[in-house]
Amino acid sequence: VEDARMVIDMGGEHIGVSYGKIKRTPGQLDCERAREIFEGVQPQAVRIGLTVAEDIDEISENLREAMPDVLHLSGDIEGISPAEVAELKSRFPELKIMQAIPVLAGVPLDEQKVMQYVKDYEPVSDFFLIDTKAPAAGDIGATGLTHDRAIDRAIIEATDVPCIIAGGLDASNVAEAIY
């Protein structure tokens, strides 16, 4: 909580944590700890809960315990369907959904399902987080890998859903990603 408060005091507007009852990723917090952090930054910060879980009942239970403002779905995109995301939204009407869109590193756009994912998840997503997926990985992001930034542009131009770009960004390449 102390670190999260420090971020808010320095001007941060969003606090995100990976959380859940079943530990799936390094650094993942349990629901109780996530709730403590989220309560510690209210009402100053938007609270983002990241999950790689794919079972909506498990996700719902975790949501009830931690109560983020935004749910960042970062697991295998084919593991939770748009209909299941819609069900989550009906269970938690105030919840915003940030759907991770996987862009395969080193793979041309026409050989990926990216644009189909955008079309399929657009009706149930409040934000897209465009991130690099290692070709052999199940989850999306946290690889340090970059991808073709022209794909980011294609996605942004194809949707009205606000997009956040990610994927190996650092001081040497963030300007290129923005332009």
Report the location of each language-model feature.
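Conserved N-terminal beta1-alpha1 strand-loop-helix module at the mouth
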Residues: 1-179
